[in-house]
């Protein structure tokens, strides 16, 4: 829960200001920072909360009992996923991302442990890699087109922003793959 609280500073602090106005790009006009910070706090909290509940319900259905550890990994997964898009999505996008994160973390942790036979005692791959990857792609799906980010596929932006996000994750994966050899 400490990490959940700290992500308000991490994500919210990225807005640079919590109140007042700042000069817009190019020195023309002003923009209100309070509304952006409030949106960032709301989407961060909603995604994490929904991911926690979905991970708990998913494990309860799958294993016939709730799994506290997996539920808390769901919290972290939601926080990781929403970090990429928290300033450019609405509450609906945050809710959908939370659902995706809650299911993805359980499935990827199980895949790594049982299929790949890799010892990942804290589920770091499922929490950070899988949900970071998916969260970056979700920008291209759920972005509302605000704050300098193009609109996502489901918000009338077509495939442009999705293509940019996919190029980004492929480039990072290639870079990591090459440098880890």
Give each language-model segment a name.
Residues 1-181:
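Glycine- and aromatic-enriched membrane alpha-helices
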């Amino acid at each position: 829960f400490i990490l959940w609280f700290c992500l308000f500073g991490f994500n919210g602090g990225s807005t640079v200001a919590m109140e007042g106005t700042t000069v817009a790009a190019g020195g023309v006009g002003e923009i209100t920072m309070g509304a952006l910070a409030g949106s960032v706090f709301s989407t961060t909290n909603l995604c994490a909360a929904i991911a926690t509940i979905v991970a708990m319900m998913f494990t309860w259905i799958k294993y016939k009992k709730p799994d506290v550890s997996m539920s808390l990994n769901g919290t972290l997964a939601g926080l990781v996923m929403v970090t990429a898009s928290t300033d450019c999505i609405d509450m609906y996008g945050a809710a959908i991302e939370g659902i995706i994160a809650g299911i993805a973390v359980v499935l990827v942790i199980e895949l790594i442990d049982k299929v790949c036979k890799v010892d990942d005692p804290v589920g770091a791959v499922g929490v950070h890699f899988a949900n970071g990857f998916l969260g970056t792609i979700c920008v291209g799906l759920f972005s509302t087109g605000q704050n300098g980010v193009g609109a996502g596929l489901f918000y009338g932006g077509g495939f442009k922003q999705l293509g940019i996000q996919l190029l980004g994750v492929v480039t990072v994966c290639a870079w990591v793959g090459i440098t880890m050899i």
